Swiss-Prot record:
Gene: MIT1
Protein family (similarity comment): Belongs to the CorA metal ion transporter (MIT) (TC 1.A.35) family.
Gene disruption phenotype: Severe decrease in the number of sporozoites in the mosquito salivary gland. Normal asexual stage in mouse erythrocytes and normal exflagellation of male gametocytes.
Ranges facing Extracellular side: 381-396
Function description: Mitochondrial inner membrane magnesium transporter required for mitochondrial magnesium homeostasis. Involved in the development of the sporozoite in the mosquito vector midgut.
Organism: Plasmodium berghei (strain Anka)
MF GO annotations: magnesium ion transmembrane transporter activity
Mitochondrial matrix side: 418-433
Annotated compartments: Mitochondrion inner membrane
Protein name: Mitochondrial inner membrane magnesium transporter MIT1
Pfam families in alphabetical order: MRS2-like (PF22099)
Membrane topology, from the record: Multi-pass membrane protein
A GO term from the CC aspect: mitochondrial inner membrane
Amino acid sequence: MFRWLNINKCMSKIIHPYVLKPNNCIHTNWLFKFATLKNENKIFPKKNLNNNILMQNIKVADDGNAICEQLLFSKYDLPYLLKIPVSDLRLIDTGNNNHNPTILIRKDVILLRTGFISCIIRYNETWLFEGSNSVVINAKDLISKNLKKQNNNKFKNCNNDEIVESLCRKRNCTDNGKENMKQINNDEKEELNYLNIINNFYRYNKGKAYFEFLCLDICMQLSIKEYENDLEGINYKIRDIILLQRKEENNELNMLTNKLLRDMMKIKNNLQKLSNLLNALRTNIEKILNNENDMKNMYLTYLNKNPYNNLKDCSDLEILLETHLQLTDELYGQLENVEEKITHYEELMRLNLDYNRNKFILLNAKISFSTLLFSISSVVTSLFGMNLKNFVEDSNYAFIIVSIFVSVWSIIGIYVTKNINTLLKFFDRYNFR
């Protein structure tokens, strides 16, 4: 005991001068060798150890072309670097799956979350979340290509008249020149809109669209296309389940041994999530169309050049939003058709289940009737096995008569169990219980 007291006094004399003085706090590192510290990660486990996010930046250069680069940011530094409040940034964060699609209009910025793409749009740059995602990569390629084509359209529009005149002079026919001109325009439209989505915005505003509207349109198009692909995938799964069910229709126990109902419930839950996302996106577009201030504040390039918001015509933005609203309505209609197909198929599955239950009940009734009839015949035959004197065994025809009775009774029992439905109807008619 005396030894431990001396050791504690010596340790206190060594430790206190170094711990109390802030200048000599570095020398206390060697004390960790003599202390047993618990790991904080084991006590308080962190779920999200990786707080970094890969951002795709698309910036418009002075010559009009796009400068694309990927940057890795910390989520803690992202609000300060992008100058966006944390409350708004949380709504479009791809790591948070609890929020629905949103379109937020703030000062000099548009915040967009469609369910597949989350982006921050300014008048001269765009920040896309999750730069390694395939949809984001496709959006980046489309934005850069369309910016190049907008620059090339200025020279093409000047040379279109000269091309038509040269074609007319060579062929001496104005009709052929017009047809060739239509082919040139159709090729350009197909190159711009290869997403199989009707894009009226670029048809009427080719080469005149602002950068923010270009990014908004491409992100919305790609997201709607992804919604269509998900809906088609769900539709294919439903078809496969229906085909499996048709193959097993001849099996009486098919609905009780397979997992079709469980798979259908999973598909229905996924379809419900998809409908909620589409409905949220649709309501956000409608809110912007009904709010004139938000419509005017979305002209970021115009507001950057003109500080005073004197904008009167918002027709190009209305065309853009109404086009995507129409596409979401059509997609929502297709989704409702798939839901009706699922409900119809569920009703058929329930009817099949009821039919199988009735078959089991009927089988149980047949077994009970057959056991009743065979028990009666067994009672008759058991008379020969008794040790009592009943004077039946002395007769020469007794065995023949009893065997004929048992065989006839068994035939009657088989006939009754085979046509048990008529027997049950007879019991129901005369209230036999």
